[in-house]
Amino acid sequence: MTTNNLIDIALHIPTPDAALTVAYSPIRLNLAGRQPLELRLTAPASGHKLPIVILSHGYGPSNYLPSKDGYAPLAQFWAERGFAVIQPTHASSRVGGLPAETEGAPFFWRERVEEVRAILDRLIEVEGQAPAVAGRLDHGSIAAVGHSLGGHTVSLLLGARLHGEVSGDSRISAGILLTAPGRGGKDLTDENEARFPFFDLDFAHLVTPSLVVCGADDNPRFTSRGPEWHADAYHDGPGARALLTLHGVGHGLGGIAGLDAKETEVEVPDGLEATKRMTLAWLRTILGYDAAAWTSACAALAGPASTLGQVEEKSSG
């Protein structure tokens, strides 16, 4: 939506006006030995050389939102402002994922990475199923964004490693980690260390330029640490250039998975709007479409919108 009477302070963060979009769903990619991978593609109705964002959903408590059909607040906002957003229904999805008896269930962390890689491999095929978008995407300008478990997926694609295993993909030029899991192993409770051995990522190889986003009121149940656990990729990953901490919001960052959703501990329209505007500004700058977007957004967050959050950045030197 473009008119929103519920936001106030976030209006200080500059952002482009919304433009008309088109959406295609379901786009299907046949994969060997399993059901097709289903996607949603939302893109500007006009323009060429559109940058691409692949948005990886979380695991979440809902049946439907952790799929290609969730995260409309983010996907629509970005598409209205120049990005082609591709959303897979991952193998872990309750509504459209792989059967529960399949190896790797229920989280399918390896399969999720391979699903994103399949999208990258077959972008021309994706475009071919979206006639109004075909030929308009910039295959050399791709960002990956992941929320929660999707942040784990994207961390691997950005270069993080699990026990030395290399999963990074150089076709991805930039990333955003939205309340992604932090360090695994002994940083987890005993129960969760046993349940989530794949959280034990080494972020030292995360070299792709990235933004890490955390909710100051997040309550990570996997660890005895506090919300700062979700910022580990920023502190450990050389490519993680900035840390955005949003005040007054938790794991759902004010409602990114869906409006009025149980994924959102507390619905905060200004917090959600700040998430949308700040992530858009990062994408526009890091992919080379507006050199001043991120600087201007950070200035607003440090000034008239300071109650909404803060940004920490590593020195360029």
Language model features with spans:
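Short beta-strand element of the alpha/beta-hydrolase
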Residues: 49-58
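Short amphipathic alpha-helix adjacent to the substrate-entry channel of hydrolases
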Residues: 65-88
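N-terminal cap/lid segment of alpha/beta-hydrolase-fold proteins
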Residues: 1-48
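Conserved alpha/beta-hydrolase "nucleophile elbow" surrounding the catalytic nucleophile
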Residues: 57, 146-152
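Alpha/beta-hydrolase-fold serine-hydrolase catalytic core, especially in secreted/extracellular enzymes
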Residues: 248-250, 256-317
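Alpha/beta-hydrolase active-site loop
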Residues: 104-139
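The feature captures the conserved acid-bearing segment of alpha/beta-hydrolase catalytic domains
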Residues: 167-248
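Short glycine-enriched nucleophile-adjacent loop
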Residues: 124, 151-165
